[in-house]
Regions:
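Short glycine-enriched loops at secondary-structure junctions
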Residues: 126, 225-227, 235-237, 286-288, ...
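Flexible loop/turn segments at secondary-structure boundaries
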Residues: 79, 100-104, 195-197, 227-231, ...
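Conserved thiamine diphosphate
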Residues: 171, 178-182, 235-268, 311-340
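Conserved acidic/glycine
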Residues: 1-80, 86-87, 290-445
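Short glycine-rich or small-residue beta-strand-to-loop segments that form or flank ligand, phosphate
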Residues: 69-70, 187-191, 253, 421-427, ...
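Cofactor-binding active-site loop characterized by glycine-rich and histidine/acidic residues
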Residues: 54-57, 61-219, 229-249
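Long, amphipathic alpha-helical stalk/connector segments used for oligomerization, subunit docking
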Residues: 271-276
Length: 451
C-alpha cells in the first residue's frame, strides 16, 4: 500500500479502527440523552455520510481507469449531512463543492430522487448528467431547490443574498411566479478560505447592511472550516474573529465532527433565521481528508504525522463512536452498513460510466438549443401603458438620444413589462444614478422595486 494513496489508507483504517474499537475521543461533551434526537435520525445521517465517502473513494478508483474526471471530494466534510436533514428542501440552497453528504441526505426528503446516480453521471462527465449535461461537476437539483454553483471562489454568495432579499420583496409585490414560500430561508455554504474573496465579502456586507437598516435577509451562511485553503493554512481564529461580533449577524459555532452538536446548533440556526429573518453564520469546524483533490499530494506541504493525526479525526469515526456509545448500532452493524454502501456505490457508478458522453458539437450545444418546455413571456405593454409611465417624455421616444438616456428608456420598458424586475444599488433610486441612467424609475415604479 503506497503512503501516497491516502484514500486506500483511510478506507482500510475505517474498518480496522471500528473492529478494534480504536475511535477518536469527543472534542465536546454532549450526551445524546440530553437532547430530543432520535437514534434512527443518527443512523440515517451516518448512512448518508458513508455513501458520500464511498462516492469519493470510487471516484478515485475510476479516475485511475479513465472513467472519472472529477476527484474533489467531500471527505472530512460529511457532517454537513445534518444541514440536509434540518433544513427542508423548500429552502433554497447554494452549496459548497464538498456537499456530497448534504445532497444525499436532503434527497431523502422527496420521493423519486436518485442522488447517487446523478452524482455518478456528473463524475463521469456523462451527457445524461441531469444538472450540467456532463459539462461540469456541480451539486444541483431543481426538485431539491439547489441551483448549480461553481462555488470555488464564492461567486455564489452574492446570488444567495439576492435570493434571500427577494423572498419578502416578492411577497410585498404580490409576484405570483415564486419558487420560495414566505417563511423560507436560504442556505449558502462555502469553505474557510473562500470568505476572503471580494465576491463573498460583498455578499456578507450587503446582508449585514440591509439588516442593520431594518430590512430582512433570511440567510444561513455555513462556513465549513477545515483550516486550509488547498495548501495555505487559515490563520487561527480568523473566521471566528471576523464574524462573532459582525453587525446584523448571529454567530453559531459547532463541531463538524459531532453529529449531536451539529443537529442541536443547526436547529438553533434554523429557528433564529426563520423567526428573525436575519443572517446567521454557522461556523462548522471540521477537517479535510485525501487532500484537495486526487491530483493533490498532501505530503508536499504537510508532515506525515500531521496527515495521520488528521485522518484519525475522521468524522465517520466520530459518528461511529456516537452510534456505539448510545447503542444505536454495534460495530458489526456499522461494518455491514459500510460494505453494503460500497457495493451500492460500485454498482451505481459502473452503470453511470456506461452512459453516453459528449462526443459531438451538437452534444455540447444541446443544453442550450434543447426546447424542453413551452415558454411564455409577458405581453408587450400597449401604447397607453407606456404613455402613462413615460409621461411628457413620450414625445421624445422617437428622437435621437444619447446612450444613457436610451438605457433609461429601455429600463422603463423592461420594468413595465416584467413586474418582477428590481433595480437596486448606490444612488440609483431618487437621484437616478450619477449619469441619470435610472432617472425617474423610483417615481415610476416605487421604492419597493427601485432602491
Amino acid at each position: 500500500m503506497s503512503l501516497f494513496n491516502r484514500a486506500e489508507i483511510i478506507d482500510n483504517n475505517f474498518t480496522s479502527f471500528v473492529k478494534s474499537g480504536n475511535l477518536p475521543q469527543a472534542r465536546i461533551d454532549l450526551p445524546l440523552s440530553h437532547t430530543n434526537i432520535k437514534p434512527s435520525d443518527l443512523v440515517s445521517l451516518f448512512e448518508s455520510q458513508v455513501l458520500s465517502r464511498h462516492m469519493d473513494l470510487k471516484a478515485r478508483l475510476m479516475k485511475d481507469d479513465g472513467k472519472c474526471y472529477y476527484t474533489i471530494g467531500s471527505s472530512g466534510h460529511e457532517g454537513n449531512a445534518v444541514f440536509g436533514k434540518i433544513f427542508p428542501y423548500t429552502d433554497m440552497a447554494f452549496l459548497h463543492y464538498r456537499s456530497g453528504a448534504l445532497f444525499i441526505e436532503r434527497s431523502r426528503q422527496t420521493p423519486g430522487t436518485t442522488p447517487l446516480y446523478d452524482l455518478a453521471l456528473s463524475f463521469t462527465a456523462s451527457a445524461d448528467d441531469p444538472i450540467s449535461g456532463g459539462r461540469h461537476k456541480v451539486f444541483g437539483s431543481k426538485k431539491l431547490n439547489i441551483p448549480p454553483q461553481t462555488s470555488t471562489v464564492s461567486s455564489h454568495v452574492p446570488k444567495a443574498v439576492g435570493v434571500a432579499l427577494s423572498i419578502e420583496r416578492a411577497r410585498d409585490l404580490d409576484i405570483q411566479e415564486r419558487e420560495l414560500k414566505n417563511d423560507s430561508v436560504v442556505l449558502c455554504s462555502f469553505g474557510d478560505a473562500s470568505i476572503n474573496h471580494s465576491t463573498a465579502l460583498g455578499g456578507f456586507n450587503t446582508a449585514g447592511w440591509v439588516t442593520h437598516q431594518g430590512g430582512h435577509v433570511p440567510i444561513v451562511f455555513i462556513c465549513e472550516d477545515n483550516g486550509i485553503g488547498i495548501s495555505v493554512p487559515t490563520p487561527e481564529n480568523w473566521i471566528r474573529d471576523s464574524f462573532v461580533n459582525r453587525p446584523g449577524y448571529k454567530y453559531i459555532a459547532c463541531d463538524g465532527l459531532n453529529l449531536i452538536d451539529l443537529i442541536e446548533k443547526s436547529k438553533e440556526a434554523e429557528l433564529h433565521c426563520r423567526n428573525h429573518r436575519s443572517p446567521v453564520f454557522i461556523h462548522m469546524k471540521t477537517i479535510r481528508l485525501m487532500g484537495h483533490a486526487g491530483s493533490d499530494i498532501e505530503s508536499g506541504y504537510h508532515k506525515q504525522e500531521t496527515i495521520e493525526k488528521t485522518e484519525f479525526n475522521d468524522p465517520l469515526l466520530h459518528s461511529c463512536r456516537i452510534l456505539i456509545q448510545n447503542r444505536c448500532l454495534s460495530a458489526d452493524d456499522i461494518l455491514n452498513l459500510y460494505e453494503s454502501a460500497r457495493q451500492t456505490v460500485n454498482h451505481v457508478c459502473e452503470s453511470a460510466a456506461k452512459r453516453p458522453k459528449l462526443k459531438t458539437a451538437e452534444n455540447v450545444m444541446e443544453s442550450i438549443t434543447a426546447h424542453t418546455f413551452n415558454r411564455t413571456v409577458p405581453t408587450i405593454p400597449g401604447q397607453k401603458d407606456r404613455e402613462a409611465i413615460f409621461g411628457k417624455k413620450s414625445a421624445r421616444l422617437g428622437q435621437p438620444q444619447h446612450m444613457a438616456k436610451l438605457l433609461n428608456y429601455g429600463l422603463s420598458d423592461i420594468m413595465l413589462r416584467y413586474p418582477n424586475t428590481l433595480v437596486f444599488g448606490e444612488d440609483v433610486a431618487q437621484k437616478g444614478g450619477v449619469y441619470h441612467v435610472t432617472a425617474d424609475l423610483h417615481s415610476q415604479f416605487g421604492m419597493r422595486r427601485v432602491f
